[in-house]
Swiss-Prot record:
Assigned GO CC terms: small ribosomal subunit
Record lineage: Bacteria, Bacillati, Bacillota, Clostridia, Eubacteriales
Biological-process GO terms, alphabetical: ribosomal small subunit biogenesis; translation
Identification of the protein by name: Small ribosomal subunit protein uS4
Domain annotation S4 RNA-binding: ranges: 99-165
Gene Ontology MF annotations: rRNA binding; structural constituent of ribosome
Annotated keywords: Ribonucleoprotein, Ribosomal protein, RNA-binding, rRNA-binding
Gene3D superfamilies, alphabetized: Ribosomal Protein S4 Delta 41, Chain A, domain 1, RNA-binding S4 domain
Amino acid sequence: MARYTGPVCRLCRREGMKLFLKGDRCYTGKCAIDRRAYAPGQHGQSRGKKPTEYGIQLREKQKVRRIYGVQEKQFRSYYDKANRQKGIVGENLLRLLERRLDNVVFQLGFATSRPEARQLVRHGHFTINGRRVDIPSFLVRVGDVVGVKEASKSSPRLKEILSSLDRTPPKWMSLDANAATGTIIALPDREDIQLPIQEHLIVEKYSR
């Protein structure tokens, strides 16, 4: 499945919630879902059909995929890995997604959205333990230090972001704003993931 390249605001309207795909715009009155809180398309306002159980499960899976910017094949791979781990499958799945480098970069405040974080990672602006990593899906581990590459600190976009760095990261990571680094101090717990996700619906879908 090809990566979606269309208007991302349509995705938020389709899922009926903010997915925070456009950075700062999502926090302003320009956010599309604030102005048009209904599904996109000609019949978006008139869709009154009650969704099926499968439809509800599918929408939840699509919502999580879109939040983290993961394609179907890779998402299924995460699910299979989560299913092999000990513990609750749905929570294992969310932990894997949270550990992605692009998500960590976003949570540390080095990008205003996950899509922007993914792009910055791909362009080689970040290091892990001093070594450049340009793979957005790289899974961080406890003890890893994620930092902005020294040469990248003077790039216009990162310079702008770092000059107003004020995000408070989740408790499983610590931020050193002066050094532009973040340290993974623990693996994320379910309560650390402040997203309206019902992961059990995803498990039910894949268990059909």
